[in-house]
Every structure is written in C-alpha cells, then in structure tokens.
C-alpha cells in the first residue's frame, strides 16, 4: 500500500468516476484502475463497486476511505513541519441550506487552522443537492433540518443513501422580517398576521415539495409566494416588499444585515437542525472542528 494509492482512492471517491479522477490526478485511467485493483487485492477488500454511472464505495470502502483521509492528513502535517519547500493544501467541503450560522462556522474553521494555503468549499444549495453531495463525497458534511413534516421522507432518503443525521439543536420556527415591517413591534407573530405579506422561500427545483423545503411553513398556507435561489435576493425582497421567510431564528447581523430581525412564530412545532454524513466514514479534523463551531453558534 502506498500514499499514491490512497490519494487515488480519495480522488475517485470524490469524483465518483475513475475517468474524471484520472484527469484531476494528471495520469491515465488505466493507471488509476490498476493501482486501485492492486490495493483491493492487497487489502483483500472491494473498495469500489462499478456501476453504469461510475463507481460507488462499498461498505468496506467507506471505512477504508475514512482511514485513508486520516493517513493523508498526517502526511500533510509532517510535510508542513519537516519540508520547508513543500506546503500541502488541505481540503474540506460542506453543503448546507441557507443558514448564516453555517457560514459563520465555516469562517471559524478557516481562522482556527490559519493554514498558509487551503482549498475549502462551502455550498449553499437545494436540499436534495446537499444529500447528493454528501452521498457522493463531494462534501464531507451537510447541514439540514428535520421536522414532523419532512422527517419520514428525508429519513428514508438518508437511509437509502447510507447517510446518518446527527442533531445539533432544536429550534422553534421564527419569522425573518425587516425592522420597518408593520409587524416588527409584535413579540410573536401568527400565521394570520402574515396573510397580507409576500412569503419568500428558496426554490427547490424538481424537488419543490414541502418535504424538501428549507422553510417550515408550506407555500400552500400563503396567498403570496415568491421563490428565490440565493440569500441576498431573499433579504433584498424582504426589505423591498415587506416580505417574510420562516427559519430557525439564528440570525447574523454581519451576514444578513442589521435591518433584518427575527420574531417567534406562534406554532406548536419545532425544527431539528443537524449535520448529515456518510455512515462509517471517519471525519477529518476540519469536519470535526466545523461541527464544534456549529454548536458554538447555535447553542
């Protein structure tokens, strides 16, 4: 077993395709295929299962990938300490719903490690894209929420993709409005209060159902609905149209603006916000630090 073989395994797992991995590694496809075949033979396990669309990790492969990442991280650390002319570039990726605390936690991870160079990725995406990213190891972690309305459907989807959900905290739904909104002076807001105002939600593409919605309240309960793709547009419309959205209530003035405020929504429901990850995969130190940073921002 060589470090080169471990790098091949990690890259193929991230790409989900040997041809694409070979391009990223600047080697031929037969070279990658042969190296992984030799490794599987040596370790007496099947790491990848071949499919019509590419490759997926086997159960043994998932465990092996976690250990391979740890070994490569340790090598990166040693090279950084003992080889002045070689500076390894750490990698970490997370996919999340449009939560400001998820972005703040990402910032904390970068500041904590303060690396000379790095290649980190944060993706604010649609719910099904988050699940696909973590399933295909495009991202190590995903940040989503479960509620009484979506738990059954999403839990089945997570189980099917061999993902696990770890709850970070439970929140009661809140309404985000601008500080000049007619309802801004109320201590809490009811659904009846909101009927005359536009409801801003994030578009979910072909998965545009309440099960994949980022917002706790269904658009079916609102007369005026506007769907958007990004957070900046959503908050601009909240201000410009006196609209609203429904979320966890964890707000960041630095990211959302100081004229966006949060008010409790008067409903007997809750949101379980947490992270999703691949079962059996050992998390990197960056992923572990990110989870701790999330807890710090949400609790």
Tell me the role of every PLM-derived stretch.
Residues 89-153:
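Central regulatory/effector-binding core of bacterial HTH transcription factors
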Residues 10-28:
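Short helix-boundary/capping micro-motifs
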Residues 135-139, 145, 204-261:
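Hydrophobic hinge/microswitch elements
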Residues 160-166, 171-172, 233-281:
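Beta-alpha-beta core module
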Residues 40-57:
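A short LG(V/I)-centered, amphipathic sequence patch enriched
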Residues 157-173, 177-199:
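Flexible hinge/capping segments at coil-to-helix
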Residues 42-43, 64-86:
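Alpha-helical linker/hinge and terminal dimerization helices associated
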Residues 102-108, 151, 191, 195-219, ...:
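Secondary-structure junction motif
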């Amino acid at each position: 077993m060589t470090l080169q073989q471990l790098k091949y395994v990690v890259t193929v797992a991230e790409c989900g395709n040997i041809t694409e991995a070979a391009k990223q590694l600047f080697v031929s496809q037969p070279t990658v295929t042969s190296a992984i075949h030799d490794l599987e033979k040596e370790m007496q396990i099947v790491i990848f299962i071949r499919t019509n669309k590419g490759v997926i990790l086997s159960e043994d492969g998932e465990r092996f990938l976690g250990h391979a990442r740890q070994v490569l991280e340790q090598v990166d650390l040693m090279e950084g300490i003992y080889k002045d002319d070689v500076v390894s570039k750490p990698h970490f990726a997370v996919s999340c719903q449009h939560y400001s605390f998820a972005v703040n936690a990402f910032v904390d991870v970068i500041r904590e490690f303060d690396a000379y160079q790095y290649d980190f990725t944060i993706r604010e995406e649609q719910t099904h894209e988050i699940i696909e990213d973590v399933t295909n190891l495009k991202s190590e972690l995903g940040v989503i929420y479960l509620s009484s309305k979506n738990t059954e459907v999403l839990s089945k989807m997570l189980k099917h993709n061999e993902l696990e959900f770890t709850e970070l905290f439970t929140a009661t739904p809140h309404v985000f409005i601008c500080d000049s909104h007619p309802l801004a002076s109320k201590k809490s807001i009811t659904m009846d209060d909101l009927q005359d105002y536009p409801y801003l939600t994030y578009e979910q593409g072909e998965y545009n159902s309440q099960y994949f919605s980022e917002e706790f309240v269904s658009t079916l309960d609102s007369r005026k609905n506007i769907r958007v793709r990004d957070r900046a547009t959503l908050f601009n419309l909240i201000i410009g149209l006196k609209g609203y959205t429904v979320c966890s209530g964890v707000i960041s003035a630095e990211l959302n603006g100081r004229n966006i405020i949060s008010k409790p929504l008067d409903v007997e429901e809750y949101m379980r916000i947490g992270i999703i990850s691949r079962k059996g995969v050992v998390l990197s130190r960056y992923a572990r630090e990110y989870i701790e940073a999330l807890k710090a921002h949400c609790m």
